[in-house]
């Protein structure tokens, strides 16, 4: 059987053929760019996913190791400061201590320098010592004055012995010294007739003694007999001072 072949369609010649070839070349270019962009996006997403997975795995491994094994690594020392910075700070502190304080701008120009005398502390020390001594002396003087005032007030509070009190004391001492003789006189005067001329100078009888000027008076020489012995008088004065304080 004979097959009949169809003749090929004639290709366009001239400018139509050139335009068709250009269109055939330009059409597949956008499709290739899209495929490349898609490949790049897939690669970046895969890389990110892998990095995230590796980070998670590393963290889990570190946590397991920290929980299971003790820490054996020693802590590291902190970095030491520079010696130059330390020297500068020491120089600045030395200047401040010596009494030189300066202010400078950013350009390094000194606005003003304040000179403080270095011997200020040395001068203030003896002044403070003098003030301390003055305060101590004033305190001692005030304490002495307060003591003297207390003593004077105590002496002023004590009542001075009047001459009347001295007479009363003397009478009391004589009565205490001749208490027995006084008792005998009182008893003799009460029982009139028992009294003798030796014990008393007067009695209740008609016969009166030579020393008596009036009948039955108490002038029996008690004061003279008591004051004859000075020791007895001193003892009686002390006893009266104790028993009857003024």
From Swiss-Prot:
Main localization, broad class: cytoplasm
Chain intervals with Polar residues compositional bias: 63-87
Tissue-specificity statement: Expressed broadly at a low level in the early embryo.
Parts of the chain on the Cytoplasmic side: 189-246
Biological processes annotated in GO: dorsal/ventral axis specification; negative regulation of DNA binding; negative regulation of DNA-templated transcription; negative regulation of protein import into nucleus; negative regulation of transcription by RNA polymerase II; negative regulation of Wnt signaling pathway; positive regulation of viral transcription; regulation of JNK cascade
Residues in compartment: Extracellular: 1-170
Pfam families the UniProt entry points to: MDFI
Superkingdom, taxonomy of origin: Eukaryota
Record-linked InterPro entries: MDFI/MDFIC (IPR026134)
GO MF, any single term: DNA-binding transcription factor binding
GO cellular component terms listed in the entry, alphabetical order: cytoplasm; extracellular region; nucleolus; nucleus; plasma membrane
Bilayer topology: Single-pass membrane protein
Annotated MDFI domain residues: 74-246
PANTHER family on file: MYOD FAMILY INHIBITOR, MYOD FAMILY INHIBITOR DOMAIN-CONTAINING PROTEIN
Domain notes: The cysteine-rich C-terminus is involved in its granular distribution in the cytoplasm.
General function of this protein: Required to control the activity of various transcription factors through their sequestration in the cytoplasm. Retains nuclear Zic proteins in the cytoplasm and inhibits their transcriptional activation. Required for dorsoanterior development. Necessary for siamois to activate downstream target genes, including gsc, during execution of the dorsal organizer program. Also regulates the transcriptional activity of TCF7L1/TCF3 by interacting directly with TCF7L1/TCF3 and preventing it from binding DNA. Involved in the development of lymphatic vessel valves.
Family listed: Belongs to the MDFI family.
Protein name: MyoD family inhibitor domain-containing protein
Organism: Xenopus laevis (African clawed frog)
Gene: mdfic
